[in-house]
């Protein structure tokens, strides 16, 4: 298994997030608010907001919560102003970690993220220390039980995608240039392709293999602690781990 935010891990992630629905709502609301602030409150003309709203609906977030978050972003309602901050650091065995945050207090978040790294055997680095080990991509997941590989590949390339990865048992992973994600998604939907998830992500270009249970346990505790922080939106890392070991330490 490669990387903590790789799609192979979606079942583990879903179970974890279902158990923390309130925290998940908080993170999605922040994303909606920031998206609306940056690109306006109309999802028709704001692809980032459109994706965030779709995520909220899939999580069964009440419509009024979504509408309030949009209005806070556009300034129609008073609300907290969030800043996007990215942290970079290292975990056990030199695993590279990127942490994307939305925060109303950068100093607080920096202190908390630094503490989590230190507590779990990692260390917070400087900006740029590991980001060169990742590529930013758009990723679209399409369920494998609905379509054959040839159909998905053909539709994806026609829609403007770069590639289709077929390693996962449940999903085809369609990759795009970051700026093309929303266009490719819309083109696929026009062709009747069902999409499980569409998101901007960071994909590791080099990986660190983790084989022993002790290191794997430390690493997963670090990554989980980061994700459990309210200010953290996404965590990326470049580890490789067998499915068996992942299940054992998750």
Curated annotation (Swiss-Prot):
GO CC annotation: cytosol
Compartments in which it is found: Cytoplasm
Signal sequence, start to end: none
Pfam families: TACO1_YebC_N (PF20772), Transcrip_reg (PF01709)
Positions of disulphide bridges: none
Gene Ontology molecular function: DNA binding
Keyword hit for Manganese: no
Keyword Lyase annotated: no
An individual GO BP term: regulation of DNA-templated transcription
Keywords: Cytoplasm, DNA-binding, Transcription, Transcription regulation
Family named by the database record: Belongs to the TACO1 family.
HAMAP family in the cross-refs: Transcrip_reg_TACO1
Protein name: Probable transcriptional regulatory protein PERMA_0079
Biological source species: Persephonella marina (strain DSM 14350 / EX-H1)
């Amino acid at each position: 298994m490669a990387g903590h935010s790789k799609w192979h891990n979606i079942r583990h992630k879903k179970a974890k997030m279902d158990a923390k629905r309130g925290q998940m709502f908080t993170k999605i609301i922040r994303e909606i608010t920031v998206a609306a602030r940056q690109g306006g409150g109309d999802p028709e003309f704001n692809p980032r907001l459109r994706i965030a709203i779709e995520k909220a609906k899939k999580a069964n977030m009440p419509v009024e919560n979504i509408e309030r978050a949009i209005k806070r972003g556009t300034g129609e309602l008073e609300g907290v102003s969030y800043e996007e901050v990215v942290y970079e650091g290292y975990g056990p065995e030199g695993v590279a970690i990127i942490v994307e945050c939305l925060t109303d207090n950068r100093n607080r978040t920096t202190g908390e993220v630094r503490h989590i790294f230190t507590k779990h055997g990692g260390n917070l680095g400087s900006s740029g220390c590991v980001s060169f080990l990742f590529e930013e991509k758009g990723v679209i997941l399409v369920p494998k039980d609905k379509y054959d590989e040839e159909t998905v590949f053909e539709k994806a390339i026609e829609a403007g995608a770069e590639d289709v990865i077929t390693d996962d048992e449940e999903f085809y992973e369609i990759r795009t240039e970051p700026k093309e994600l929303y266009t490719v998604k819309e083109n696929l939907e026009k062709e009747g392709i069902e999409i499980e998830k569409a998101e901007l992500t960071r994909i590791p270009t080099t990986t660190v293999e983790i084989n022993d249970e002790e290191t794997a346990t430390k690493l997963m505790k670090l990554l989980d602690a980061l994700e459990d922080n309210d200010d953290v939106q996404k965590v990326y890392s470049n580890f490789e781990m067998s499915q068996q070991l992942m299940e054992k330490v998750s």
